[in-house]
């Protein structure tokens, strides 16, 4: 039973770390990366459609993204959606190809982004700790119902704590890498 709780906690913690990685990819670093545009929705025939369903996005070089729009009639809507996003990008259209130069980040903007990244990481840590709390609560419930011994309960809580420490360290490592990436000029 403790093993099941442990496996469940591990899976939930892995999902939290994955979600954090996903949030970090959306934070612009001044380097062109196709996943930067993943969150953009384009109004297409009256329905909000993910940008990656309407265009092929590639990194032309380290500072330019190139989009090849599949449907020429959607090119203007794609360009407008990119401009209206909160990413601060200014696309240039040439027919069905839209080029997006990545503006260099100012020192102030870098510091703001680092603050945002740290807040996101703290949110990830809190999520992992909440999972630990839930798992420990499940273990205490089993102990209360006399389904496990006190020794088993302590071993289970220790295992959950080790798991928590492992995932918090992963989050800290991801944060350090992102901060380094943001501070590169």
UniProtKB/Swiss-Prot annotation:
Record bears the keyword Cytoplasm: yes
Molecular function terms, GO-annotated: ribosomal large subunit binding
Cellular component aspect of the GO annotation: cytosol
Compartments reported by the entry: Cytoplasm
Gene Ontology biological process terms from the UniProt entry: cytoplasmic translational termination
Disulfide bonds: none
Keywords, ordered alphabetically: Cytoplasm, Protein biosynthesis
Major location category of this protein: cytoplasm
Keyword Transcription regulation on entry: no
Signal peptide: none
Matches recorded under InterPro entries: Ribosome_recyc_fac, Ribosome_recyc_fac_dom, RRF_sf
Gene3D superfamilies per the UniProt record, alphabetical: 3.30.1360.40, Ribosome-recycling factor
Pfam families: RRF
Entry-linked PANTHER family: MITOCHONDRIAL RIBOSOME RECYCLING FACTOR PSEUDO 1 (PTHR20982:SF3), RIBOSOME RECYCLING FACTOR (PTHR20982)
Record-stated family: Belongs to the RRF family.
Function text: Responsible for the release of ribosomes from messenger RNA at the termination of protein biosynthesis. May increase the efficiency of translation by recycling ribosomes from one round of translation to another.
Name recorded for this polypeptide: Ribosome-recycling factor
Organism: Pseudoalteromonas atlantica (strain T6c / ATCC BAA-1087)
């Amino acid at each position: 039973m403790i093993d099941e709780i442990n496996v469940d906690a591990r899976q939930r913690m892995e999902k939290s770390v994955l979600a954090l990685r996903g949030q970090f990819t959306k934070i612009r670093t001044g380097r062109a990366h196709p996943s930067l545009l993943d969150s953009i929705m384009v109004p297409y025939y009256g329905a909000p459609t993910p940008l990656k369903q309407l265009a092929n996005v590639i990194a032309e070089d380290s500072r330019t993204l190139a989009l090849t729009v599949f449907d020429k009639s959607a090119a203007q809507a794609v360009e407008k959606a990119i401009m209206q996003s909160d990413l601060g990008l200014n696309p240039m259209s040439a027919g069905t190809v839209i080029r997006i130069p990545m503006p260099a980040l100012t020192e102030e903007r870098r510091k703001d982004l680092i603050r945002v990244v740290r807040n996101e990481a703290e949110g990830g840590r809190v999520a992992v700790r909440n999972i630990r709390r839930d798992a420990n609560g499940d273990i205490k419930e089993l102990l209360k119902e006399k389904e496990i011994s006190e020794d088993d309960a302590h071993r289970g809580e220790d295992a959950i704590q080790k798991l928590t420490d492992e995932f918090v360290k992963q989050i800290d490592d991801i944060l350090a890498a992102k901060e380094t990436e943001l501070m590169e000029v």
